Amino acid sequence: MNEYLLPK
């Protein structure tokens, strides 16, 4: 999974 798809 890509980090930019995760909530900050």
Curated annotation (Swiss-Prot):
Annotated organism of origin: Cycas revoluta (Sago palm)
Keyword Lipid biosynthesis: no
Protein name: Cytochrome P450-like protein
Any one GO cellular component localisation term in the record: extracellular region
Localization: Secreted, Cell wall
Protein keywords: Cell wall, Secreted
Cofactor: heme
